[in-house]
Amino acid sequence: MKLPRDLHGEELAKRLSRLGYQVVRQTGSHLRLTWNEGGQEHHLTIPRHHPLKLGTLAGILREIAEARNLTREELLKLLDL
């Protein structure tokens, strides 16, 4: 699947909230998200850029997929991307 080229950082954070991520703080132009489930914890920083660069988006999605034991395609489907 191709990654969207017009996705904003705030929109990505909103879609990640469907997976249980919560915004815990905002510092400057970055959002800090945390996911807690079953004793596991994952922290993630997302820039609020308009739009996110493809390499940045790919790196964020790769990190989430590894933390959640999902493939990239499964993650994209869950996020409706």
Residue ranges and their predicted role:
Residues 9, 39-40, 72:
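Low-complexity, compositionally biased segments
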Residues 3, 42, 75:
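Glycine-rich, flexible loop/turn motifs
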